[in-house]
Amino acid sequence: MGPRNQTAVSEFLLMKVTEDPELKLIPFSLFLSMYLVTILGNLLILLAVISDSHLHTPMYFLLFNLSFTDICLTTTTVPKILVNIQAQNQSITYTGCLTQICLVLVFAGLESCFLAVMAYDRYVAICHPLRYTVLMNVHFWGLLILLSMFMSTMDALVQSLMVLQLSFCKNVEIPLFFCEVVQVIKLACSDTLINNILIYFASSVFGAIPLSGIIFSYSQIVTSVLRMPSARGKYKAFSTCGCHLSVFSLFYGTAFGVYISSAVAESSRITAVASVMYTVVPQMMNPFIYSLRNKEMKKALRKLIGRLFPF
């Protein structure tokens, strides 16, 4: 596309959540409720892990990091959506859009890595219980956390810097409720080959590789559990993994839903809704999954609530 069709972009336009201003209270209330539930739920998980010494283990330390990441990922997208709904203004500045792209990549990448590390933790606990304290020592799982942070941050910075090199056309309407790197790249007039290569590479590193690791870990766990002689041992092992398996299924299920909707949906609004659900629903449901299905977490939460509201 020729230079005459390019322009210096100062802002992008996001998709309207609703076309009717009189109905804006409905989506605003929905997003606000989901956001508050996500923040409060994950904040309770953070406080429970900090306050209860029985939860100072690798598994709950990883859950602590996952809950913190959930708060950050949701906060990256939902507040801007709420502002746009209330103001009936769909614009987002160029700098704001790049910042949102970078933060979404950081926290989505972290979430994927943490889920893989948690699967490995369950694999070691069930398949190698006698060596658990040796294999999952504080230095090793601390290193895994730092490595996850480094990889996701570097990926986000590289992809954001490559977006900075792009020239954009006059059409700067993003068919989503927030800035997402793939959709922003589609608006560029300049060559996007390197950007697309980076996206495919990142999808492998933060999608296919963690997913393969999780599937391998659970295949080994299932094999090990089936060899257990007692039904009680099998139940305990499966219940230990149940929470993580539910969270993993929800996260990758919504991610797969985004991919399918973008590939087959005729309406861009369907893809937009699927994308925002990916950054909200798993993060909102994680605290409920862990608080309802994990006995130790339920006990810690009851103690915490008793301290916060002693009446």
Swiss-Prot record:
Membrane topology: Multi-pass membrane protein
Family matches, as InterPro entries: GPCR_Rhodpsn, GPCR_Rhodpsn_7TM, Olfact_rcpt
GO BP field: signal transduction
Any GO molecular function: olfactory receptor activity
Residues on Cytoplasmic side: 51-57, 119-133, 218-244, 291-311
CC annotations in GO: plasma membrane
Extracellular topological domain residue ranges: 1-29, 79-97, 155-196, 266-269
Disulfide bonds: C97-C179
Glycosylation sites: N5, N89
Main localization (coarse): membrane
Top-level taxon: Eukaryota
Transmembrane segments: 30-50, 58-78, 98-118, 134-154, 197-217, 245-265, 270-290
Subcellular location: Cell membrane
Keywords from the named record: Cell membrane, Disulfide bond, G-protein coupled receptor, Glycoprotein, Membrane, Olfaction, Receptor, Sensory transduction, Transducer, Transmembrane, Transmembrane helix
Family of this protein: Belongs to the G-protein coupled receptor 1 family.
Function as written in the Swiss-Prot or TrEMBL entry: Odorant receptor.
Protein name (database record): Olfactory receptor 7G1
Species of the source: Homo sapiens
